[in-house]
A protein has these predicted regions:
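Bacterial Sec-pathway N-terminal export signals of envelope proteins
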Residues: 21-68, 72, 78, 222, ...
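Sec/SRP-type N-terminal targeting helices
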Residues: 43-47, 60, 92, 106-134, ...
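Terminal intrinsically disordered/low-complexity segments used for targeting and assembly
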Residues: 1-34, 204-250, 300-304, 310-336, ...
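Short segments within alpha-helical structural elements
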Residues: 47, 195-220, 409-473
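Membrane-embedded beta-strand positions in outer-membrane beta-barrel channels/transporters
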Residues: 99-101, 145, 249, 352-354, ...
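Periplasmic alpha-helical coiled-coil/stalk elements that build and connect Gram-negative outer-membrane
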Residues: 54, 136-255, 400, 404, ...
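Small/polar, glycine/serine/threonine/aspartate-rich low-complexity segments that form flexible
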Residues: 23, 70-104, 232-240, 287-357
């Protein structure tokens, strides 16, 4: 019994969690935050920032000395000189050698310094690129979010219209039975009802597709249970429309990320020119090397008189012709000297500086300078183009927002008029003073007016978001 109660409790808990998960409605802030944290493009941009940091480490490493160590062991097989006789004999000798080399750039035409400055600028550019990517994702999410809201409200309108038409169809049946309207009018209402059903299905499909688009930006897989809050207020909370286009442009000129990217890329191009020019200057390098070797052959440890041939004639005394004799000795061989004794005895060192002056390199350095100058001119043009694009975009966005506001206000006024006309038509139709064609026409005009209010409302909201974006107001509050 206790086991059954425990299982029931677990089942209720799982069911409760599932219901909560399905009933969760996402806010715009949650959508934007989640997209920034999980979007694949942003993750790739973060990797670019890491690569820029690695490039800086490489640039710093150019100021440090290079150290290389080497060691070798060799076997010499074949004719080798015998140290006791001086003759060549077939034998095997072994040698071990080791060494180390240190090199450092003392002067390289300021290329190392400019490379480090370029690496620092590349880090800044990568950070700006990441910020730009997040801003673009936030705008795309906001647009997709508002599209979901529009489709949700549009579905409500279509369902409400279907409900009204169902009631109207029932009322028309009563009027036909009473003889107030002809049966043909009932068929017209039935056809309109079928069209309303089709509109509901179309609205449901549009809502599903918009949810799919938004969930794709958020990298969510369960888009069917995905939903957003019904936040539909049309408000200019930051009073952005009170600003002038020139004021918005000045604010955007100071803080827009795409301008910062273009300016940073211009500085990088300037450093590339300096690096390329450095190839014309001489380079000065310092070096130090150490080496030693160890042999494993027998060595001469002493001499003893040669008993079989104690002396050798080395000359004659002038006048007497007496022989001049020299004692003969035999070399005594011993084991090789200890490893570290040989290593210490045979060590050698060298150090110095090397100056290299470029004279002619097949126009390679000159062409690199010319290429870097062309890239610099492109960067200057890109900055100028970004300024022009920003100015055009700001003024266009302001005009679009103003036009969207006027369109929204006009659509609201039109809806009020259409609602009054529809109410009047309903009264006339209910007493048989209007035919079904005219009544359906009034109903269609009302539905179109409701849809137009929704369209202009969300268009205005998004246009306001874009203006705030240029003015430096974030889409979400931290």
């Amino acid at each position: 019994m206790e086991k059954r109660s425990f299982l029931s409790l677990i089942a209720m808990l799982v069911c409760s969690i599932t219901i909560q998960a399905q009933s969760k409605k996402w806010t715009l802030e949650e959508c934007v935050t989640y997209a920034i944290q999980n979007n694949i493009s942003i993750k790739q941009s973060e990797l670019d920032s890491k690569m820029a940091l690695i490039d800086k480490k490489s640039a710093v490493g150019r100021f440090l000395p290079s150290l290389n160590a080497s060691a070798s062991h060799s076997w010499n097989i074949g004719l080798n000189q015998d140290i006791t006789t001086g003759l060549l004999q077939n034998k095997t000798t072994q040698f071990t050698s080791a060494g180390a080399n240190v090199g450092i750039d003392i002067y390289r035409g300021l290329q190392n310094q400019n490379t480090l400055r370029k690496a620092n600028l590349s880090i800044v550019a990568a950070k700006y690129q990441l910020v730009k990517m997040k801003e673009d994702i936030a705008l795309n999410v906001a647009n997709a979010f508002l599209q979901v809201l529009f489709n949700k409200e549009n579905l409500k309108v279509q369902k409400e219209q279907l409900r009204i038409n169902e009631k109207q169809y029932a009322r028309s049946e009563e009027l036909v039975k009473a003889g107030s309207i002809p049966r043909g009018d009932l068929l017209d209402v039935k056809a309109t009802l079928a069209l309303n059903n089709q509109n509901v299905i179309t609205a449901e499909n549009s809502l599903l597709i918009s949810k799919l688009s938004l969930s794709h930006l958020l990298q969510l897989k369960d888009f069917e249970n995905f939903d957003v809050v019904d936040d539909t207020d049309v408000k200019d909370e930051n009073n952005i429309m009170a600003q002038t286009p020139s004021a918005i442009y000045e604010k955007a000129f100071e803080g827009r990320t795409e301008l910062k990217i273009a300016r940073t890329n211009l500085e990088i191009a300037e450093k590339n020119v300096a690096i390329a020019k450095g190839a014309f200057q001489p380079t000065l390098q310092g070096f130090y090397s150490f080496n030693s070797r160890v042999a494993y052959s027998d060595r001469v440890t002493g001499v003893i008189p040669n008993a079989s041939n104690p002396t050798s004639i080395v000359g004659f005394v002038e006048g007497t012709n007496q022989n001049v004799l020299s004692p003969n000795f035999t070399r005594v061989l011993g084991n090789p000297a200890p490893f570290f004794d040989q290593f210490n005895t045979n060590k050698g060192q060298s150090f110095g500086m090397q100056l290299s002056v470029p004279v002619f390199n097949g126009f390679s350095a000159r062409n690199n300078v010319e290429r870097s100058k062309v890239s610099l001119e492109r960067s200057k043009i890109a900055v100028e183009q970004q300024n022009l694009d920003l100015q055009r975009n700001v003024y266009t966005a302001f005009a679009d927002a103003k036009g969207a506001l006027n369109a929204y206000e006009s659509s609201v006024a039109a809806l009020e008029a259409r609602q009054g006309a529809y109410n009047y038509a309903t009264e006339k139709y209910s007493v048989g003073l209007m035919n079904s064609f005219d009544f359906n026409q009034s109903q269609t005009l009302l539905t179109n007016a409701q849809s137009e209010v929704l369209r202009t409302k969300y268009d205005y909201i998004f246009k306001i978001k874009i203006l705030e974006f240029y003015f430096g107001i974030p889409l979400i509050k931290n």
